[in-house]
Amino acid sequence: MLTKEFAQRVELSEKQVRKIVQHLEERGYQLSKTEYRGREATDFKEEDIELFKDIADKVKQTNSYDLAFDELEKEKDFLQVIVKNDDKNLPTNQNVAQLVEDLRLEIQKMREERHLLGQMMNQVHQQQQELKELQNQLTSKIDSNSESLKAIQTSQEAIQEAQASQAKVLAESTNKVEKNAVTEDKADSKDSKVAGVNTSTDAKTDTKADNAGDGTTTKVDKEDQISATEAIEKASVEQSKNGNAAETSNKEATIDAEAQHDAEQQVAEAHAEASKQATSNDSLEAKAENDSTASQSEMSEPKPQEEKKGFFARLFNL
């Protein structure tokens, strides 16, 4: 029977039948041939129906013609299944052993190739795993670098904030120092005024002592000088206190106002003391002039020397 009729018998398409015939002929199996419309065609027999059905079932299971034929070769002897009982198609006794050996070698070669293919697939799978690991490592490194960059940016911002705060503190310190310098200049000017007052007081005392012209006025002059010297020393002490207060105000800016108030109060006290001394000097000058007049009129009558009086005794006429 021809291909179309045989395909209907085995319930396959003509294309599938031709494909099976091609694989059988490539493996050295020969089917019966006939001539149809001037061309050679396969002449299928009744016994071929079972063979083609078995091959079609294996192809469906393996989804491959090559694998189907390999399994069928293991299950049964194809030489006895598909070789026809035709003497012209049977090999000679001399070639049977060689043919079987060739087939065995071919099958072994195919198995080796399949094993190599499996190894190559395993290598490819292993390389894919390595590539995934490398990708994960790169991702982790990128993440760590990103975190490092964020940390660096944060530290830079902190440094900038610290620099800004330091500059602010420095500016405030500079302003405080300038204020303290102004306060110190004011204290120095006030101290110089006090020194001027003391100097004028000393000048008045010296002038009045020169006008007295006798021993009594000289004693008064010395005592006045001692009192003036004490006032000057007191003013110097007050000035040094003012200087110390100014220096302390440079270190402790919060007590500048109190130190300045104390310095002004001390200067006022020194000025009041100087005024008292000037007043007492004027009274002593008047008394010395009276004593000088009395001594000139009574030069011929010596009098016993009176007891030396102190500054405060003379001041209160004791």
UniProtKB/Swiss-Prot annotation:
Basic and acidic residues: compositionally biased ranges: 175-193, 219-236, 249-274, 300-310
Polar residues compositional bias, start-end: 237-248
Organism superkingdom: Bacteria
Key words, A-Z: Coiled coil
Disordered, as annotated region: 172-318
Keyword Ribosomal protein: no
Coiled-coil boundaries: 67-157
Name of this protein: Uncharacterized protein MW0361
Phylogenetic classification of the source organism: Bacteria, Bacillati, Bacillota, Bacilli, Bacillales
